[in-house]
Swiss-Prot record:
Role according to the record: Acts as a negative regulator of innate and adaptive immunity by maintaining immune homeostasis. Negative regulator of Toll-like receptor and T-cell receptor function. Prevents hyperresponsiveness of the immune system and maintains immune homeostasis. Inhibits jun/ap1 and NF-kappa-B activation. Promotes Fas-induced apoptosis.
Family listed: Belongs to the TNFAIP8 family. TNFAIP8L2 subfamily.
Pfam families hit by this protein: DUF758
Domain of life where this protein originates: Eukaryota
Protein name per UniProt: Tumor necrosis factor alpha-induced protein 8-like protein 2
Organism field: Xenopus laevis (African clawed frog)
Record comment regarding domains: The central region was initially thought to constitute a DED (death effector) domain. However, 3D-structure data reveal a previously uncharacterized fold that is different from the predicted fold of a DED (death effector) domain. It consists of a large, hydrophobic central cavity that is poised for cofactor binding.
Tagged with keyword Protease: no
Bilayer-crossing regions: none
Tagged with keyword Nucleotide-binding: no
């Protein structure tokens, strides 16, 4: 017997459309102002560190696509109770990671090169488990790309170096993270 669901078809179409719309102009529809500012700073950090504008744009575009797709899945109640536990674990781990990133910034000489990459890899694994049954292998690749990019220990070391040209971006990122935490969005 053929299983057809217009709801599933509509969700699939919506995800497809959203995957094509993840550009900076569309971010404002799905991501709040503070998050958008953080994404802009992450782009600048990536571009300055890699010296590769195209790669930096791609990693931010992939991050936006994944965030939007997960948001669509969540809004359409597509996650099982077990997957919702994974989502909560991810949110908690991301919150702890943000607190750690802020602490490393605010308290000089506390940055440990391996801590943030480890947290980001844990977050990546949770997201991959969360979307395993919902998104395509191409989307899984995007998740890998984003987390692997920002978990680069050398990039993070430069970001936290008090004499680095990346440091002003870190201040803006941490200010944004603090705001999201205060507003209980992260």
């Amino acid at each position: 017997m053929e299983t057809f669901s217009s709801k599933d078809l509509a969700l699939q179409a919506q995800k497809k459309i959203l995957s094509r719309m993840a550009s900076k102009s569309m971010v404002n529809m799905f991501i709040d102002e503070t998050s958008s500012e953080i994404l802009d700073e992450l782009y600048r950090v990536s571009k300055e560190y890699t010296k590769n504008k195209t790669e930096s744009q791609k990693v931010i575009k992939n991050l936006i696509k994944i965030a939007v797709k997960i948001g669509v899945l969540f809004r359409h109640n597509r996650f099982s109770p077990e997957e919702l536990v994974l989502a909560k674990d991810f949110k908690n781990r991301l919150h702890n990671g943000a607190m750690t990133a802020i602490s490393f910034y605010e308290v000089e000489f506390t940055f440990e090169k391996d801590v943030l990459p480890e947290i980001l890899m844990e977050c990546k694994n949770l997201v991959l488990r969360l979307v395993e049954k919902h998104l395509t292998p191409k989307s899984h690749g995007r998740i890998q790309h984003v987390f692997n990019h920002f978990a680069d220990p050398e990039m993070l070391s430069q970001l936290y170096d008090t004499k680095s040209s990346l440091r002003p971006h870190l201040q803006k990122i941490c200010n944004g993270l603090n705001k999201l935490i205060e507003e209980e969005k992260l």
